[in-house]
Amino acid sequence: MQRRFMLLSLAVAATLGGSTTLAFAADQTMNVDVCVVGAGAGGMSAGMAAVDAGYNTVILEKLGVIGGGGNFMEGTFAVGSRLQIKDNVGINAEKQFKRVMDFHHWRINGKALNNWLKETATTIDWLEAHGINFEGVHTAFIDGNRTWHMFEGGHGSSLITNFAEKIEAKGGKILTSTPAQSLIIDKDGTVRGVVATNEDGNKLTINAKAVIIATGGFSCNPEMVKKYLPYAGYESAGSPGRTGDGVQMLEKAGAKLVNMNVTMQAGLWLKDVPTELQFGKDGLTGATYVRLLAALFQPYLKVSPKGDRFADETLPLEYISNAAEEIGGEAFAVFDDNTRKEMINVGLPRGYFGMVAPGTKFDNFDKLFAEGVKKGFCYKANSLKELAKLTGMDPKRLQNTVERMNQMTKNQKDDEFYKDSQWLREVKKGPFYAIKGSLRTYATVGGASVNEHFQPLTPEGKVIKGIYAIGQDAGGLYSDSYDMHIAEGTASSWAINGGRLSVEHIKTYLKK
């Protein structure tokens, strides 16, 4: 399985160029055609399309570097693309529309979905015309759909740097460390611009004929996470800076918010361990506990905080995440000394997103696990009763769970959740081990209700003029789960296509 995200230091190094920190000693005013809020994949795509159309364009980025979540994507979704046709991948917009609508039980915006799907192949052509190259079309799943168009080199920072150079070459401005604070809205409810600030706190008023909101959702805002997500303890495993600025501005402008409880789920991670210690600052460096994370990821027994098994442990990330949400967002991997020896001597059967290859021998298990015990996310005991006491589980429930697992393993039949029998393991020989995990998310995917042109809608279905919402600030694409298993790369594609297509509509809007 491919690694889905690089981490920040590599992305920062790749994107320091192509942006300006605007320094001014007093409040200033700027007049533009298009103002884009957010310089991630969606915002940069919008900026590229806007300068291509000849619009005087400014992109605002609150962080000191550009790219956001765009630096972390490895590929993007499309159907019916040139690359898929070349490789005889028989997926088109109609087939994918039916598949996605069925997955979401028709509780999503079908018109917006259909329009986006039909444009994804054209957007791949558009990206290639701008010098963005692809390695091919892949899937991370044995039975997945080949929709994931992998960027050359395996990461999206190439798109960010390429677009930054081209945008500035065509006269567009990219202002870093310049967060948008509020929208300028006239008495009729039409958005007329943005008020931002620079590093020194001085105000920048941007009068714009059209505004595009692309701030990446709210996964880094604990208050919004607690308010909207099923598990209040969700931590972000994705890009920093996603604090819900755009969603909040859209709501204040009158937009209806939809699917606010849905995230791009990252599964179970080591409880209370910083992301960089699990996944590394650049995908490798500093990933001290990545093998323990991979051990947690293995398809062996997982139990609730009470000690009950709660799912087929081989489920895809979005499904196992949903199951974990139902038990409170936290769970334990439980195994015995025989499984420990298997991980050390035979290897980890499942890899972890390119960071740990399948079959890797966990030869430093004892050292890392001992560190985990000291830090409070790993547990070791000579009996199940003692393990239950250490973890806070109910001893009787854990004992019953283990006895049932041992019997199912002996019978080579999971009659509880019907997991493939090759992944059944007895928990019989002490010492016994537990690793505590909690849910994390790469990004939230709920936001403003939009039409097929990415225009925000009020609760009554009225278009809010002068503004567009794209990427993770636009809701309506997902009902209760991110559909990674059938449509890999949709979050980035929704953003990139939203950037291009919103500008296509701006061309019509500004002619009126």
Region locations from a protein language model:
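N-terminal secretory signal peptides and thylakoid transit peptides that target proteins
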Residues: 1-11
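Beta1/beta-strand and adjacent pyrophosphate-binding region of the FAD-binding site
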Residues: 28-42, 58
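C-terminal structured subdomain/cap of oxidoreductase catalytic cores
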Residues: 28-29, 47-49, 55, 349-350, ...
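Conserved N-terminal/central alpha/beta ligand/cofactor-binding core
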Residues: 56, 62-173, 177-179, 302, ...
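Conserved redox-cofactor binding core of oxidoreductases
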Residues: 118-202, 221-224, 270-271, 279-280, ...
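A glycine-rich dinucleotide-binding beta-alpha-beta segment and adjacent secondary-structure elements
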Residues: 182, 397-481, 485
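Glycine-rich loop(s) and the adjacent beta-strand/alpha-helix scaffold that form part
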Residues: 199-202, 206-276, 488, 492-501
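An anion/pyrophosphate-binding glycine-rich loop and adjacent beta-alpha core
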Residues: 247-249, 256-390
